Amino acid sequence: MLEVCLLGCGGMVPLPGRRLTSVLLRQNGRMILVDCGEGTQVGIKLLGWGFKSIDALCITHYHADHIAGLPGFLLTLGNSGRTDPFTIFGPPPLAYVVNALSVIAPQLPFDIQLEELSDQRKSEGRIAEFIINAIPVDHI
C-alpha cells in the first residue's frame, strides 16, 4: 500500500505549525521525498519514518518554497549514518541548482546522483518500485 504524508503544504512563508512544501511517499519500506521546502527535516522527524532510508528526492520546480530546505536536509541525511548514494530527480538545470545549494553542505558521507527529467523529451526515472515522469503543468 502506498502511504502519502504531507510534511508541509504552506504557502511561500513558513508559519507556526505549518511547514513549506514537502511530501513523503512510502511503499513496501521504500521512500521518496517530493520537494524539500523549509521545515522538511522537522516534518520527517515528527513523522518518525527516519532519514537514512529515504531513497530519493524529486524536485518539481525551483521556487524557494520547494527547495530551500535542501542543504539542511542533506546534512541531516549525512548525520543519519547514510553512506549509500542518494538520487535527486528534477527538471533542468538540476546540476546547477543542486551544486549551488550544496555549497552549504560541501562534504557529505554519500555521493549525490543527479537525474535530470524534462517534460520536453521522453524521460523517466526509477527508484525501487517508483517510476518518475516529468509532465508539463501550469503553476502560478
Model segments located where?
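Binuclear metal-dependent hydrolase catalytic cores
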Residues: 1-140
